[in-house]
Structure formats: C-alpha cells, structure tokens
C-alpha cells in the first residue's frame, strides 16, 4: 500500500475526530450517513469497508389514548338511565318551544328590549335572539318576578357559540359611541327652527347676531399661535378698542396677543414663561385692567403689569406640613367683585382654599390658614358676584359644593378623612355620576356646571324657579332640608335644567369648562363652552342655545379652552396646538 500523503493523513484525522464527536453526542447514525456521502481513499481503490450498525434502537411508541371518549365507544348504555330521560325531555321541550316560536313570529313584540336583542341574521332574516324576544305577555309577566333567571338566560344567549353577534356588537358600539359624542350644539339649526314658541322676543335677534360672527379674517388661524404647547387657560381682556387676549399652556408659557395691532404683517404675539408648570387660570381685575394675574401648578400666583411690563410673584403656596419646599399646586383663582376687590381667593389640587389681601406682603402660610373644602382635587371654583362670602367649588370627588366663609371651624370638617382640618360651613352639594370639571356663578344667581357625565347643569338660586329662599338671604348656618340625616354634606341642590353635551376630551385635549360672560352689554346672561366637533356653543341662563360657532374649513382642532369678552359678544377658543380661534 502506498504511503498516505500529508493531506490524506490530515483528512483522515478530521474524519476520525468528527466520528468521536458524533459518537459522544449519540449520533452514530449521522456518522454513517456522512461516511456514505464522503467515501474514503480505500473505497476509491475498490476496497470495501466493513459495515457497522451502531444506529440507536427505535423507541417503541405507545398508542396515544384519546382525551375524551364517547359513551358509545366506552360501551355505556343510556336508555334506562335518569340522565338519558332528562336529556330526552329537554329535547322534546326544545322542539315544542321551537314550534311555538314559529307561531309567535307573526305576532307583535311585548316588553322592552336592548337593541342587540333585536338584531337579525343578514342572510336568513331571522332574529338571533328570537327565543328571548318572542314571548307572550303572560310569559313576560311571569319572568318579571324572577330577574335572576332572566339574567342567566341573557348570559346563556350571549355565550352561545352558534350565535355570532361580534359584527352586530361592533355596529351597536359605534352607535353608542356616536350617542355619547352628541352635543346639543351639534343640532343648532334644528333646535333654532323648532323653538318658535319661546317667549323671549329677543331670542331670534340674538341668534341672528351670533350667526353673523365670523372667524377673525386678518390672519389665518394657523398663524395665530399664542403658546408653544397645549392651551390650558385663556382670558379675554375687557378692553373693547385695543383688544388683548392672553393664554397659558401646560408647561407654564404665557402668550399675549394684541389683536388690533396693525404694525406688523404677522400677529402681534409675545410668549412669556412666568411659570414652571401648567397655567390653570388667567384673570384681569375689573378695578385695575392694566394688570393680569395668573396661577399655575408650580404653586405660584404672579402679577403681570402691562404698564410697567413687569411680572412679579404675588403668592407662593407650599405645604405647611412638609419640612422641605413642597409646592401646593394652585388650580384656580378669583377676585372678589363685591366688598373688597383686593382680596384674592384660590384653590389647590389638594382640595384646599386660601385667601390673601393683595395690598399686604405675602408671608409663609400657616396650617390653620388653609381651609379644607374637598379631600380631592378642586378643578374650579367661583365667587358669588353679589356676596363675596359665598363660593362654589367643583371637584374630582364628583360633587360641587356651596360654602359660607363667615362660619369657619374644625367641627365643620367632620366629613373629611384628614384630621385637624378647618372648613367653612357648607350649605349643600350637588352629586354627579362622574367628576365635576367646573362651576361658575353669574349676577342673577344662576350657577352652571359641567363634568365628565356629559351634561351641562344650570341651577337657579334666585328663588324664581325653586322653593328655596334667595341664596343672598341664606344665613351662615343655613342648610336646605335633606331626607338622609346621616349625610354630613347633604346632596340637596338640584338643577332646573340639564343639557346634553359631550365632555369626553381624552388625554390630548384640555378639559371643557363652561363660563358665564362677566358683564354682558346686551343684558342677556349667557355662557360659552367648547364643542368637541370643533366649535363653540353659547347658551342663555334658561338653557336655550344661542349659537354654535364653527368654520369647517378653518377650524382645524377643538377650541377646548373658551372665553367670551366680558362685555361684547366676541368669543375665543384655544386648541391643543397653541392656536387661537377668534369669532367676532
């Protein structure tokens, strides 16, 4: 035999090393296949290699038992068992009911139903829940006495695999969502044409006046960007000649727009940053219109002087119970209109109330100077413009409450979960299904509130439409009657009218808040609120809609934060992109 070359030796070593490795892995059969595919040199010379059979022994597979067996395969007979008789009776009963249902198809329906109960199959035309719907009156009366069985029957229908209601449910959910998104302002044209019996002679002329309002034409709304981020607060300055609009956003920017400035081709807008967090409220004192006050979640209230062009801090609230500098986020501010116009009221996200005289320097607050009005966030509050000691608050706890600041004590806070709190006397409250977003008070003692229950509620405390005495005559211990004596805060305030309005703003749109016009020059009390269909709705204090302001071509977003000029019937709304829509 000729000696092997170096290359052949290396090749044989590689083959042997691979065989050893495969043998360790218990893959000898794979080694044989490799050997057959790559014959060695001796095979090329005609010498045959002894065939080895080291293949692993096959594992005997046991037949897999079925997880379920029928009674027939198991050899079980059912004819004489109680279970078989029960099944047979059920089948006979089902056949009988089927014949009755065929007969009932030609009769009218009895009782009330959900829409899903009346859905029919698109191919056959039969009701998908005909067994539930097609019943005689005596059967309905019988089932009314056993609501539990009815509920179980409904669940059985909804869980029936033979009934496909997925597509129908989607359609009905769409209809439901559309119903939730409807607002009365969406049907302004229809409501206007159907309200000819309204006894107010000025209603039609007032609607005509608002119908003539158009978007500010000098600039494209896309160019009127007053803040960098989503607008959270807006204020229409009372000036009628040189109009000024201010707006704040969620990061503390404050934009000022000189509406009637003609010096530049672009809108005369200046954006400041007086706050570190979201601006909650902007207001202009009636007694000093050259100043603008703003509050924010950073705990500060600042004064902007238009004459001096200065911004100064008026109040900084920090938690008196904390050793470190922990700010109390200010959620709303208002100035007294009756009595002393220099007193500023404010509320916090923690449910507190605080008041400060602007003529005196601010000092660090003490624990007993904070009043407890709610245990949760106060999103909005208002002052009775006729009596400054009466305020109303709207809270995340699903209520709005009316308070008397003349009667303050610890005993008034027994309702609170917090200890050693001080509260004013509460006249009563209104309870909502969901959070109450805002409340506002006008000169004729009407209050308007709205919240996430998709309603606008108007309350009459002037005694014109209720048996209660006028709110201005309530004593500091007055409380309307309540049926439940265990209620620490009675739910005794009822609205005299309720308006359907979509308030589901979601995450990216600011909360909708209804606001009265402060001093209407035409003498008609009215409030404005944004409409989720990219518009502004205006109502009078009777709940009659006066206008639905929009422009389908130019209004590109929801003007969620809305305000009216204090005197003139001009409206402005701010969007999530920091843009303004002015109707004049």
Swiss-Prot record:
Q: Phosphoprotein as a keyword?
A: no
> Does the record's keyword annotation contain Coiled coil?
yes
Q: Which GO terms describe its biological process?
A: DNA damage response; regulation of DNA damage checkpoint
Q: What is the annotated signal peptide range for this record?
A: none
What are the UniProt keywords, alphabetically? Coiled coil, DNA damage, DNA-binding, Repeat, WD repeat
- Region called Disordered, residue ranges: 29-90
List GO terms (cellular component aspect): chromatin; cytoplasm; nuclear periphery
For this protein, the record's Pfam families field holds: WD40
Chain intervals with Basic and acidic residues compositional bias: 59-68
Q: Where are the WD repeats?
A: 226-267, 274-314, 373-413, 431-469, 506-549, 553-584
**Residue intervals passing through the bilayer:** none
Membership in a protein family:
Belongs to the WD repeat DDB2/WDR76 family.
Function (record text): DNA-binding protein that binds to both single- and double-stranded DNA. Binds preferentially to UV-damaged DNA. May be involved in DNA-metabolic processes.
This protein is called what? DNA damage-binding protein CMR1
Q: Kindly list the organism's lineage.
A: Eukaryota, Fungi, Dikarya, Ascomycota, Saccharomycotina
């Amino acid at each position: 035999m000729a000696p092997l070359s170096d290359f052949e030796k290396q090749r044989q070593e590689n083959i042997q090393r691979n065989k050893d490795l495969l043998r360790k892995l218990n893959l000898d059969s794979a080694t044989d296949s490799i050997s057959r595919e790559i014959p060695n040199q001796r095979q090329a010379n005609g010498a045959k290699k002894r065939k080895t059979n080291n293949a692993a022994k096959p594992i005997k597979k046991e037949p897999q038992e079925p997880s379920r067996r029928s009674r027939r395969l198991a050899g079980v007979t059912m004819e004489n068992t109680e279970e078989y008789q029960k099944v047979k009776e059920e089948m006979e009963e089902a056949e009988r009911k089927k014949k009755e249902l065929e007969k009932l198809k030609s009769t009218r329906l009895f009782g009330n139903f959900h829409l899903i109960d009346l859905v029919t199959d698109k191919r056959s035309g039969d009701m998908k829940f005909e067994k539930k719907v097609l019943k005689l009156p005596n059967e309905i009366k019988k089932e009314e006495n056993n609501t539990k069985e009815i509920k179980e029957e409904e669940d059985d229908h909804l869980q029936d695999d033979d009934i496909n209601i997925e597509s129908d449910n989607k359609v009905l959910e769409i209809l439901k969502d559309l119903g939730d998104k409807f607002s009365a302002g969406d049907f302004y044209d229809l409501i206007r044409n159907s309200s000819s019996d309204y006894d107010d002679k000025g209603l039609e002329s007032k609607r005509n006046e608002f119908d003539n309002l158009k978007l500010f034409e000098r600039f494209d709304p896309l160019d009127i960007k007053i803040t960098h981020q989503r607008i959270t607060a807006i204020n229409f300055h009372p000036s009628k000649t040189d109009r000024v609009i201010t707006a704040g956003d969620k990061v503390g920017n404050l934009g000022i727009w000189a509406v009637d400035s003609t010096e530049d081709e672009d809108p005369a807008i200046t954006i400041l940053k007086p706050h570190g967090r979201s601006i909650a409220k902007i207001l202009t004192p009636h007694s000093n219109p050259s100043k603008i006050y703003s509050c924010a979640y950073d705990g500060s209230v600042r004064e902007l002087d238009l004459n001096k062009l200065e911004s100064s801090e008026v109040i900084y609230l920090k938690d008196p119970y904390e050793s470190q500098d922990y700010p109390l986020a200010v959620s709303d501010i208002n100035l007294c209109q009756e009595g002393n116009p220099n007193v500023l009221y404010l509320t916090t996200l923690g449910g507190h109330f605080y008041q400060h005289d602007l003529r005196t320097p601010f000092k660090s607050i003490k624990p007993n100077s904070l009043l407890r009005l709610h245990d949760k966030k106060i999103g909005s509050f208002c002052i009775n413009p006729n009596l400054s000691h009466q305020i109303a608050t709207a809270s995340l706890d699903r209520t709005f409450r009316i308070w008397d600041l003349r009667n303050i004590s610890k005993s008034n806070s027994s309702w609170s979960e917090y200890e050693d709190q001080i509260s004013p006397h509460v006249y009563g409250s209104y309870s909502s299904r969901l959070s109450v977003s805002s409340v506002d008070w006008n000169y004729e003692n009407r209050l308007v509130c709205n919240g996430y229950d998709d309603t606008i509620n108007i309350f009459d405390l002037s005694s014109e439409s209720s048996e209660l005495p006028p709110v201005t005559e309530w004593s500091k211990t007055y409380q309307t009657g309540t049926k439940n004596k265990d209620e620490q805060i009675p739910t005794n305030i009822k609205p005299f009218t309720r308006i359907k309005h979509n308030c589901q703003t979601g995450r990216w749109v600011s909360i909708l808040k209804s606001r009265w016009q402060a001093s209407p020059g035409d003498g008609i009390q009215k409030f404005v609120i944004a409409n989720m269909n990219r518009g502004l709705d205006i109502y009078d204090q009777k709940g009659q809609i006066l206008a639905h302001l929009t422009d389908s071509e130019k209004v590109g977003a929801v003007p969620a934060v809305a305000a009216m000029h204090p005197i003139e019937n001009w409206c402005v709304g701010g969007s999530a992109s920091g843009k303004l829509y002015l109707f004049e």
